[in-house]
């Protein structure tokens, strides 16, 4: 398959026929080549547009709202620049969505994210993950108690915005209860990429774009729709994409991943397979067993997959880790398993301990509590990192360790060894692996 065949398909668009005095608006759906493939009446919601595109277009096609006859449901302004949507799906221009209040759905306050950033350079190349990152939203409904994101400037320095957009008083304490979407990201990304003249590609980042590092890109249908559009735009330009999600809903875009033919790798965070234990500190996340099943489906379809075995718990024995890695090998044959023990620093660790205790996971809470002692934490990290590396070699599972910088500092006679692990330029992945031109 040639590269030109890979990027087959572009933007579909909607054309509106002005209604008569007693008629609803009528729309025709055009392919990139100009063929009409469907007609319907009535102004569509954003969900209808995105889902119609997913269900009827070719995998690497999508309806682009900036190129379509879509008008603000409130003021009737044509949508040709920034836009958002209400919880019910009404498409609004940016002026109108900015004045629209957030709304609660399933216990999560939802609204529009005013962030101007589209794609950002990322320091995660130090973990061999990417050079760029795209976040489809601010906030996350999963509410993992150990999550580092609410302790980053992206949340801490935007408290006024969070208060204004979602009535959030404390971005960290309320993590999991707010979600601000970037609905127009696929449209803005397409135009950003068309203007972009340089592309960073370090040895450890490989020029990869990660979706997402600050939220879960498949946590619900709306986030998934944004993600699909972004993946399509990146793959059409032959840019490698790394998906990281805890949601089994990722399988909904298997058609796109297969059509990408080597430019997409899909991974999930699976620290262990004891659903109740994981649920205690990842209260809004799908069960790890469901994540495993989703990755198995994707792997069986021939799409590259990886696992983030992070963060592993102090309750996990060497045999637990062996069984987990054996399961990954047998079910997934992953390109790599990234591994990282839990980090006891920051206010989120206190929340993690409390959540485990409140969920009745007393042993987990007690073992986590012990990690406040630096020597205990160093010993636990040393044991788990060493065990996972040895077990990976024993089971023929490719491993890439993520030792914490502070751990390396106190690793004693193993400091040089773990520092080399920390500074490795490449993970064992054979990725990206684009198709060979014929």
Task: Give the residues covered by each predicted segment.
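Conserved Radical SAM active-site core
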Residues: 104-137, 141-265, 273-276, 288, ...
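Auxiliary Fe-S-binding modules of radical SAM enzymes
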Residues: 2-6, 19-20, 102-109, 319-438
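Active-site glycine- and acidic-residue-rich loops that bind
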Residues: 242, 248, 313-324
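Conserved strand-turn element in the central/C-terminal portion of the radical SAM core barrel
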Residues: 284, 297-317, 374-375
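Flexible, acidic/Gly-rich N-terminal and inter-domain linker regions that tether
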Residues: 2-73, 81-89, 94, 99-134, ...
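Non-cysteine beta-strand/loop elements that form the S-adenosyl-L-methionine
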Residues: 255-274, 334-344, 364
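Hydrophobic faces of well-ordered beta-strands that scaffold small-molecule active sites
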Residues: 209, 241, 266-268, 305-307, ...
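Active-site beta-loop-alpha junctions enriched in small/polar residues
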Residues: 214-216, 246-248, 269-273, 310-314, ...
